[in-house]
Design a protein with these regions (language model features):
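Condensing-enzyme catalytic core mediating Claisen C-C bond formation in acyl metabolism
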Residues: 2-11, 17-45, 188-259, 263-264
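Conserved catalytic cysteine-centered active-site region
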Residues: 32-66, 97-103, 108-149, 158, ...
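Conserved active-site "lid/cap" helical segment
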Residues: 13, 18-94, 98-99, 249-260, ...
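Extreme N-terminal starter segment of soluble prokaryotic enzymes
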Residues: 1-6, 351-352, 364, 371-372
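Acyl-CoA/ACP chain-elongation machinery
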Residues: 158-180, 185-189, 196, 227-241, ...
Length: 373
């Protein structure tokens, strides 16, 4: 049994899970409009970005490494985990890491720090982990891929504790890249809405700590029940219109869970025309149209490598609170399959949920979680 024993969300919304959940439940969003010229970009954009004067920077570390250290440290502080043990593994989920260093004229950091493995090693040295860290970088599904990897390693006995952190920060390189795809919305995103124009990007670090069994007197209320990654190889940047990969991941991740056990499905919900339509098709094919669906992108934007971890943690907090969080920005259904969305929070007594992500290259992931009584 794979159990969660601690977590943290470190974002522009707040530096603890409790702060983040309370703000989202109140309907707050950290999305802001930034004028042309920000990060030397030629066009205005909307995103959720850190105010870096509020972030505690770690000596000798980049901004990206610093937010990872802040989140991991806050999660570890909730436990008695001995990170120096060779049974404890650190897994970093990120899509771009320190890629901003490629655009930097500062000689402060050596060139190799742009490598994802070097960033992860910097974090493990800070805390004193003895094991070599593992990096999972699998486009937008990185956060679920990392958790599924942790599950499999724990189940195989390769480690006893897995500390999984998902994180990304934004840069001119990233924002201009999404802009070149015409995927960015100039205003706040509207997942699944008929007026949606595209996605917003965001920054965050989120950490979840799993154990193979209850150890050191710590109790885990949440179980990671199942997980699956499926790649339909439809297109390098566009999803399968039929949601083939997502459907197959859902089917595999559902396992023995009955649909009526689910409180909700927390979808990727990026607010792009193709993603939201594809996810609605996959949910329909899986026979889950009666299950409430929500997206959290209207609160944080797309936090990339952090998304799968951050949104899993918030979904756990919502079930703990007996709540289905509303989809900020949603008003009128704008996909062809009648998924069950609402902009408003709703009550629930159910104790399980399904988390979905999809990404470039045709990759798709799904995980099932259940709260233990």
């Amino acid at each position: 049994m794979i159990l969660k024993i601690a977590d943290n969300i470190y974002s522009p919304m707040g530096f603890t899970t409790a702060e983040n959940y309370a703000a989202v439940k109140q309907g707050r969003s950290m999305l802001e409009s930034y004028p042309a010229g920000t990060m030397d970009l030629p066009e205005a954009f909307t995103a959720s970005l850190f105010h870096w004067d509020e972030v505690e920077m770690t000596d000798g570390c980049t901004p990206f490494e610093s937010i990872v250290i802040q989140s991991v440290g806050r999660a570890l502080a909730q436990t008695t985990v001995d990170v120096s043990s060779d049974r404890v593994l650190f897994i970093l989920s990120t899509t771009k890491g320190n890629v901003h260093l490629l655009d930097s004229r500062s000689p402060r950091f050596p060139e190799e720090r742009v490598l994802l493995g070097e960033a992860a090693a910097t974090v493990t040295r800070h805390f004193g982990f003895s094991r070599t860290p593992l990096v999972v970088s699998n486009a937008c599904i990185s956060g679920l891929s990392a958790q599924i990897t942790a599950m499999r390693l724990l189940e195989s006995g390769a480690c006893d504790i897995a500390v999984v952190c998902g994180a990304d920060i934004q840069s001119r390189f990233i924002i201009s890249g999404f802009g070149s795809f015409k995927a960015l919305s100039p205003m706040e995103c509207r997942p699944f809405d008929i007026e949606r124009l595209g996605l917003n990007l965001g920054e965050a670090a989120a950490t979840i700590i799993y154990t193979r069994s209850e150890t050191q007197g710590e109790k885990g209320q949440w179980q990671a029940v199942s997980g699956a990654v499926r790649n339909d190889a439809f297109h390098i940047s566009g999803p399968s219109p039929k949601g083939e990969g997502s459907y197959r991941a859902i089917r595999a991740a559902m396992g023995d869970t009955a649909p009526d056990e689910l409180a909700f499905i927390n979808v990727h919900g990026t607010s792009t025309m193709y993603n939201d339509e594809m996810e609605s098709a996959a949910i329909d094919r899986a026979g889950l149209l009666d299950i409430p669906v929500n997206s959290l992108k209207g609160y944080y934007g797309h936090t990339m490598g952090a998304a799968g971890v951050l949104e899993t943690i918030l979904s756990m907090a919502a079930v703990d609170d007996g709540t289905i969080l509303g989809t900020r920005g949603y008003e009128e259904l704008g996909v062809s399959h009648k998924v069950k969305l609402s902009a408003q929070n709703a009550p629930t007594t159910k104790q399980a949920f399904l988390k979905l992500l999809s990404g470039f290259g045709g990759c798709n992931a799904a995980m099932g979680f259940r709260r233990r009584s």
